[in-house]
Design a protein with these regions (language model features):
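A short SAM/SAH-binding and catalytic strip from SAM-dependent methyltransferases
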Residues: 107-120
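N-terminal, positively charged/glycine-rich alpha-helical extensions of SAM-dependent methyltransferases
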Residues: 1-19
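A short acidic, Gly/Pro-enriched loop at the edge of an enzyme's catalytic core
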Residues: 99-109
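Class I SAM-dependent methyltransferase SAM/SAH-binding core
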Residues: 49-99
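A short glycine-rich, Lys/Arg-flanked "PGG" loop and its adjoining helix->strand segment in the class I
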Residues: 122-137
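Conserved catalytic/acceptor-binding region of the Class I
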Residues: 137-187
Length: 187
């Protein structure tokens, strides 16, 4: 569980990084492209689209570029969120709180490398899934325990405890859904 102090520190760090974030977020860009390639294959029903943990809006921009559909960007970092100058709707929101989407018109929710920053990520995924209309899609990319092997190796060599986040395993998320409700992509 991420405590309130840590959440505020994470927010501060993202706000401070907003100016240069796009230059250094290579893995996020890679997975944004994978998400967009997957979206192009899907028939998404009419409804509202959301990018949760949107940051500077790189993924939402790419989605709008191919679909002509407006994507609401949601993030808890004001500087990240408002760095993107598009006229798309933006919602400053801490994703640790329930989303204010009670209209049951949501047909697409995407989230790219955000889930690991949240308390109770498995619960959040299930809650997001429950917001979708029938036939809607939730597409989430997450770092896994295979990420950052250099960091783990260095800790092992120095005989110190691994100090990174212990990421969810894809299987942990996949097991929450029926087989016909989920598509997993190999990394």
């Amino acid at each position: 569980m991420i405590d309130k102090f840590s959440t505020e520190l994470i927010k501060k760090n993202f706000n401070n990084a907003a100016l240069d974030y796009s230059h250094y977020s290579l893995i996020q860009k890679y997975f944004s492209n994978r998400i967009v390639n997957q979206l192009k294959k899907l028939e998404i029903p009419e409804g509202d689209w959301y990018d949760l943990g949107s940051g500077t809006g790189f993924l939402a921009d790419k989605i709008e570029g191919f679909s002509q559909k407006k994507v609401t960007r949601v993030d808890f970092s004001a500087k990240m969120l408002f760095k993107n100058k598009t006229k798309s709707k933006k919602l400053l929101w801490d994703l640790n709180n329930d989303l204010p989407l009670s209209n049951k018109k949501t047909s697409l929710i995407v989230s790219n490398f955000c889930l690991h920053w949240l308390n109770e990520p498995k619960l959040k995924v299930k809650n997001w899934f429950d917001l979708l209309i029938p036939g809607g899609y939730l597409i989430v990319s997450v770092p896994t325990n295979r990420c950052f092997p250099e960091w783990r190796l260095t800790c092992e060599k120095k005989n110190i405890e691994y100090s990174g986040i212990n990421f969810l395993q894809t299987k942990e998320l996949a097991d929450m859904f029926l087989k016909n409700e989920i598509i997993t992509l190999d990394t």
